[in-house]
Amino acid sequence: MLFIDNPTVEKVLSMDECIDAQDIAFRGLPTGASVHRPRIDVYVPTDRTDGYFRWGTMEGASKDLGVFAIRMKSDILYWPQDEQGFWKEEKYNTEPGLYCGLVMLFSTRNGAPLAIINDGIIQHMRVGGGAGLGAKYLSRPDSHTVGMIGSGGMARTYLQAFCSVRDIRHVKVYSPTKKNREAYAAEMAGKLEIDVQPVNTPEEAVDGADIVAAATNAMQAALKGAWLQPGQHVTDVRGELDDDVFTRADVIFRQGVAHSRPRNEDVEHMGDGFNNGDYIAGNAEELERLPKRHRSAGVGAAPKAYPSFNDLASGNFPLRTSADQVTLYLNSGNQGLQFAAVGAAVYNRCLELGLGHQLPTEWFLQDIRD
């Protein structure tokens, strides 16, 4: 069994491989070769008077890859507001700047535990890879420009993914903090050898772009449909789109089902917090800590409100049919399967290269029936 840390993941995982692994695994969903359980979060009041503890899990498996994965994360959450009253989610584990997220990989052939993987790099890469899949199938083949709203980790892997599937030459990036967007522009221009310019408004980032991405930690709409122009392809991270985006879009696909929906009788506070169907503990005073999140037309919608990647792979729904259409890819869903596909790619590459920290498999086995 291997323990694989983030520096090792970064060394062995390319964006091209990340996109291809997901594409193959997702195409197993309509045939029954792949399966996943959507994300479930459990919230418990914590000692912070403005925060909550959150435990999150998601699972997925691929018969063809022979792997099952569970991703687990333990966070202390709090939600500061800016001068305009907009919420932003912040989190940590133990102390600010530290995080705890793990992917456990198991063999579906004999059940053996295969690996424990730090989830930091995989998390950003699998989400960026999903956005790349959407751009691969829905953006115009002649797309050369990107309008990026956001300058964090997701904005970095999103741009990597767009460059993997399209000949990207020019990028405009906006985020509220000037030094952050300037740092992003300098870093990504050097890394990808393309022109990246920071701009002063989100509208300026969107104007004239072929691919538009909202890659933020905002809990309200960061991208407005009024800014969109014919022919653009649009994607998101967490539903930070206003309802007009959905009105403007001619073609909409969702990646998959993002969150499980418990029965109402199982969840007293269904719809509070980040997702519909979270399991939330707390008394009336503690529940007041939770933010009131913007919910766009694609957030909290019925799982079958829009065609999914299953439909895309099966050819059941048309993709872009003209250069003037606005296309939208809701980049959430199938998370557990993403971790299985990308985790397997990382694990197999580590075996080939002799990387990772060896752990005795017998530590994780027992002779008492479970």
Residue ranges and their predicted role:
Residues 6-10, 246-370:
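Adenosine-phosphate binding glycine-rich loop
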Residues 139-145, 167, 229-230:
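Short helix-loop-beta connector
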Residues 165-192:
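NAD(P)-binding Rossmann-fold cofactor-contacting core
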Residues 193-287:
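Rossmann-like adenosine-cofactor binding region
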Residues 155-156:
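N-terminal Rossmann-fold NAD(P) dinucleotide-binding loop
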Residues 1-126, 130-132, 142, 337-340, ...:
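N-terminal ligand-binding/catalytic initiation module
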Residues 159, 163-164:
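Gly/Ala-rich phosphate-binding loop of Rossmann-like dinucleotide-binding domains
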Residues 151-152:
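Glycine-rich Rossmann-fold phosphate-binding loop(s) that bind the pyrophosphate
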